[in-house]
Amino acid sequence: MKIHLSLLTSLVLLSGCNAGDPVMVYESRNALQCETTGISPSESAAKLSAEDIEVTETVCGRRTGVAYPAACGMGTGTILIHKIAEADLAVAKKIGFQKVAELVDLDAGTGYEFVDCEKE
């Protein structure tokens, strides 16, 4: 009986530890109008992989609700979005990524949208 109780207690405690829940993180592409499209999706994902963070999905995006002046050398608001395990979020933040959900501010009218990535 004690073994069953210990096993049951262990299972209950471990059930709250789902390190695999996904979270979406992003970084700026650092693209400049008239000059460069910035870093590629694979280069961005490689930064996470170098920290032993598994990237399960990568998409391109664009910040919304933010004005970018139309002038060569100015930013574009394009971002790279990756799906990773929530357990890896702290490490991802240390290397410059942020949760994409933090871009959404309903009061300010800001957010993000998915866009097609150009072919690498």
Residues covered by each model-derived region:
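Short, intrinsically disordered low-complexity segments
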Residues: 54-80, 113-120
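Positively charged n-region of N-terminal signal peptides that target proteins for export
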Residues: 1-4
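C-terminal motif of bacterial Sec signal peptides marking the signal peptidase cleavage site
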Residues: 14-16
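Surface-exposed, low-hydrophobicity interaction/linker segments
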Residues: 31-67
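C-terminal partner/receptor-binding element of secreted or periplasmic proteins
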Residues: 96-120
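Bacterial signal peptide processing site
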Residues: 18-20
